[in-house]
Regions:
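Conserved Radical SAM active-site core
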Residues: 1-108, 116-130, 146-155, 179-195
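Auxiliary Fe-S-binding modules of radical SAM enzymes
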Residues: 1-10, 146-285
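Hydrophobic faces of well-ordered beta-strands that scaffold small-molecule active sites
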Residues: 57-59, 87-89, 107-111, 134-138, ...
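Active-site-proximal loop/turn and secondary-structure-junction residues that shape catalytic pockets
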Residues: 63-65, 93-95, 113-115, 140-142, ...
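A structural motif corresponding to the C-terminal end of an alpha-helix
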Residues: 78-85, 128-132, 204-218
């Protein structure tokens, strides 16, 4: 599985093929290709197999964990037992989040928003739960959701925004584009064409970044948006780029903990500062 840029490691305490079966799900394809056991089973001990050095741990990268409420208390207990680490949860079921509020202090909680319907759900439920860091993952971004960020002020209810395209096999993406997403563009990510992505429209991404900057909210652009960001007008360079060759990949300051996060390039100061202000994280491996 490709590296997820905004985390250090992944851990999956619930094994098996995710029942959500989203059409763009990379995890189901991995299970099918490797002929892994699709049965659902609980393996909480994976959350004890962690590095000594504080790091960011994405919990449930291949599974919708909120489908299994009977196992969540044990998962959160494991998180509390490792306060040196930051545990990241991401869900497409925001309606379930208030049931588990408040979340442990070392947990970040995100909601996946791919289209307007998902944005509507996020708008309603994100204010109803408590977490040290809340964020939106607009990945894959399949529609223009700016009206929810602006008119409904959703952007000010979170501490960070991730934006990305849909990466996968060319054949599968071509079919999805034809049947569901004709407004998106198919591009190869590498010279030999092994990796492809469906790119959102540049104007969608630009409006989201502008709304986030106006609110002082950090923006993390996934690497699969590199080609899209190359097409921006010269005057919009700073919207997309950290420097001449590095995409903006920012995290909220408080997501770094006392030790800081060494594997990510930068974090953003609080919204009381200039919205584009950045501070470099500490040294280390």
């Amino acid at each position: 599985m490709a590296k997820i840029e905004w985390t250090d490691i992944t851990r999956n305490p619930v094994k098996g093929k995710c029942p959500n079966a989203c059409p763009y799900c990379y995890a189901i394809e991995i299970y099918n290709n490797n002929k892994w056991d699709p049965s659902i089973r609980f393996r909480p001990e994976v959350l004890d197999d962690l590095p000594r050095k504080p790091c960011r741990v994405f919990v449930g990268s291949t599974m919708e964990l909120l489908l299994f409420p009977e196992w969540l208390p044990a998962i959160f207990d494991r998180c509390r037992q490792h306060p040196e680490h930051t545990f990241i949860f991401l869900t497409k079921l925001p309606r379930e989040l208030p049931k588990w509020s408040p979340f442990p202090e070392n947990c970040e909680v995100g909601v996946t928003v791919t289209d307007r319907e998902a944005a509507h759900q996020a708008f309603f439920y994100i204010p109803l739960f408590r977490a040290k860091v809340k964020f939106l993952s607009l990945e894959p971004l399949l529609d223009d959701v700016t009206q929810y960020l602006y008119f409904w002020n959703l952007v000010r209810a979170v501490d960070g925004i991730i934006i990305g395209g849909m990466t996968g096999r060319k054949g599968k993406l071509m079919q999805l584009q034809k049947e569901h997403f004709p407004q998106m563009r198919l591009e190869k990510l590498d010279a030999v064409g092994r990796k492809w992505t469906l790119l959102p429209r540049l104007e969608w991404v630009k409006r989201i970044i502008e709304e986030a900057d106006a609110a002082g909210i950090p923006v993390f652009l996934k690497d699969n948006l590199y080609k899209l960001a190359m097409e921006r007008p010269v005057e919009d360079h700073d919207l997309y780029w950290e420097d001449m060759s590095t995409l903006r990949q920012e995290l909220p300051r408080r997501s770094c903990g006392d030790q800081g996060v060494t594997t990510l390039k930068a974090v953003v100061t609080s919204s009381s500062d200039h919205p584009k202000a950045r501070v470099t994280s500490g040294g280390g491996d």
